[in-house]
Amino acid sequence: SNAFLEKFLAIGNFSMAVSSYFIGFTIDRYNKKKLMLFFSSICAICIFGEVVISNEIVMYVVSVIYGIGAAGLITIVPPILMTYKTEENRNFIVYNRAINIISLTIGALLAGLLTGKQFSISIKNVLLIVPILYIVSIIVFTLHDNIASKSREKSKERNFYLKKLVSERYWILIIVAFLCLGFAPLLVNFINVYFYNRYNIDVSNIAYMYALINFCSGITIFFVSKMEFKSIKCIMSMVVLIILDNIILVVWNNLYIQVCCVFAYICLFELLTSYVYDIVLSKTNSNFHGRISGVIQASCNLSETLGIYIGGVMLGLKCYWLFFGVSIISTVVSIISIIILMKEKDD
């Protein structure tokens, strides 16, 4: 039922948000490769459990456990990617995000195709593919031995970074920045609803249009990831483009322009979030990447959940100026926090 699905998803989201913070500390203490395998295994088992279990109470428990596993994977990936970072390959976090968008789009299209009239495969049987993919990723990951598990040095330098990292000002800046940055891209979770409410387009056509926009966004981000956009000027340029994009979405009703603006909206926010994430990790000691990543993920998850509820209300009332205005304000507040943080770390 819809009531069960809402509770199931809400419990999973809350589990992800809360566990991300504590998982971050675990990542800094233990071998990243083993933790990656552990979290992947949890997700595979939980997806299989969702297919075979029918009891609602047990499903809620599965949702909590899956939330922990998913939070672990999301939180651990950026610190792991930072271990591969070289002068030639600088933007792994952006590159990873591009691959995620492309694979999610392809996965959604395949799921829709397999459960459609042509193949008529049940949703539960399609879901069984997911644990298999997790197992394949575990095997591939196990064969790759180049992940460096950074040793924690008990030195004056480490103590200095510890003091700086746990300072109240530093944490507040990160939390404010990513709470706002997680909340800002309100439209991303409502693109289907937005086009349906504003233009009354057929649902199936919206689905294909959304898939095309997402796929093109992923390809664009993939190629842009080869470039370097981490100076304050570049970050500010992205923010200006986001503000202009939001304004055009409010005032210009032409459908083709709207589609182009939504494409730009996704690209800009994904690039901005990924680059800012990379900047924060690059400017801090690698011994603390796990806990920083945990705080970032917890902040983004909580604010995104809040954005889903608030954004849904505003779209339901068709308050587009308020919807995009809130997005602009949230983006600006986030970037102000990031600029202050960047200057503080440089000092």
Regions found by a protein language model. Name each.
Residues 1-4, 189-205:
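Short amphipathic helix-loop junctions that connect adjacent transmembrane helices
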Residues 14-18, 206-228:
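Transmembrane alpha-helices of Major Facilitator/SLC transporters
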Residues 18-54:
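Conserved MFS/SLC helix-loop-helix module at the cytosolic interface between two early adjacent transmembrane helices
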Residues 20-31, 115, 220-232, 315:
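Helix-to-loop junctions at the C-terminal end of transmembrane segments
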Residues 34-48, 233-248:
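Structural signature of the two symmetry-related core transmembrane helices
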Residues 64-100:
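Cytoplasmic helix-loop-helix junction between adjacent transmembrane helices
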Residues 131-151, 337-342:
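C-terminal membrane-cytosol helix-exit motif in multi-pass small-molecule transporters
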Residues 146-175:
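Juxtamembrane intracellular "pre-TM" segments in multi-pass secondary transporters
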